[in-house]
Amino acid sequence: RGTKHAEWEPYSDARETAIKHGADIALLFENDILIDGDRCAPLLLDHDGVAYHPKHSDGALDSVTIEQIGAGLEAAGIPVRPARLTLSMILRASEMIVCGSGMGIRAVGTIDGRTIGRPQGRLFQAARESWLARLESGWVSAGDP
C-alpha cells in the first residue's frame, strides 16, 4: 500500500515475475482485490458503461494519468469511478486498459491467457483521444485545465 512513494520492491518484483512469464505488465492484488499495476493504473469498463479504477482506500495510489483523462472520458459518456475491483469483475469487463504517464494508454487483451472484453474498444479510444489532447495542450501539472 502506497509503496510507489518510496518502497518500490513489490512493484519491481511483480514486474520481474511478469517479464519471466512473458507478460507485458503486472497487476498487483491484495486479498483478491486489484490494487495497482506495476507501472500503470488499471481502468476497466464494466457492462454498466462506467469505467472503474482501484480505490485509494483499498491501497491504490492516485493516478495522474486517470486524473488527466477523466474529463475527456466523462465528455465521451463514460463516467469514471473508484471501485473495489475483483478478478471476477475484471474477467466479465467489457474492456480493460492501463494508463501511465510513461506508457500512455494501452489496451489489455488477456490476463493469464483469459480474454478481457474487447480490446481497443470504446474505453481505449476515448482514453487515448483524451490523453493525446492533454499532451498536445502541454499540461505541466495535474491541476492544469
Regions found by a protein language model. Give the residues of each.
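Helix-start/capping segments and mature chain N-termini
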Residues: 1-145
